[in-house]
Amino acid sequence: MPRKFFVGGNFKMNGTAKSITHIITNLNSAKLDPSTEIVIAPPAIYLVLARQLANGQVAVSAQNVFDKPNGAFTGELSVEQLRDEKITWTLAGHSERRVLLREDDEFVARKTKAAINGGLNVILCIGESLEEREAGKTIDVVTRQLDAVAEEVSPAEWNKVVIAYEPIWAIGTGKVATTEQAQEVHASIRKWLNEKISPEAAENIRVIYGGSVTENNCRDLAAQPDVDGFLVGGASLKPAFVDIINARL
């Protein structure tokens, strides 16, 4: 069975109630590829608003979740709280949190495990810096990040994960991996899944690309055999997000 195309929109720390209402209203009224799974991740304060507004084709994701149950963790969100508000997805490991907030591989792995244990699906973000790519360490970096998660998440639980390869040097910079670069890394991730998790996981788990995805480059990327969709940043705030969702039409 072919893997279902997946497009996530990470709004990051952008938007107001008015602008997010406008974005979701436009998505609800747009003609969207019915064979594409769509998930949007607004700022935490607008999660409930987004969930109330979104129609059946658009699911809502948190941008972050903590690895502990409810308790004395100021400023954090628990899996239980997200589930209480009927949020079904969360991001984990986005490079902005890895770099700016110094979240290491093990912390990301614990968050992923906590989310899955609590019934959430996870968009697991991995990727290398420009220095790591120039040093030829791209595959080493992404497999190290995946290995940490594999220490926490059992093979049977990986069906709750979508892997998002986001080269740090391409996020918000206007630079984008070539189709060949993206396919090479995605194929390596698929190989890792086959060897470390299971052949079934390699066949079924979606590996999506993020990093300056636009309406101009999405179709070439979507045509690659191991690119199963996108995690879109800035472009998810614009009308062009619809074009990216429809990249395979």
Curated annotation (Swiss-Prot):
Family matches, as Gene3D superfamilies: Aldolase class I
GO BP annotations listed: adhesion of symbiont to host cell; gluconeogenesis; glyceraldehyde-3-phosphate biosynthetic process; glycerol catabolic process; glycolytic process; regulation of entry of bacterium into host cell
UniProt keyword annotations, A-Z: Gluconeogenesis, Glycolysis, Isomerase
GO molecular function, one term: triose-phosphate isomerase activity
Quaternary context: Homodimer.
Family the entry assigns: Belongs to the triosephosphate isomerase family.
NCBIfam families assigned: tim (TIGR00419)
Name of this protein: Triosephosphate isomerase
Taxonomic lineage of the native organism: Eukaryota, Fungi, Dikarya, Ascomycota, Pezizomycotina
Gene behind this protein: TPI1
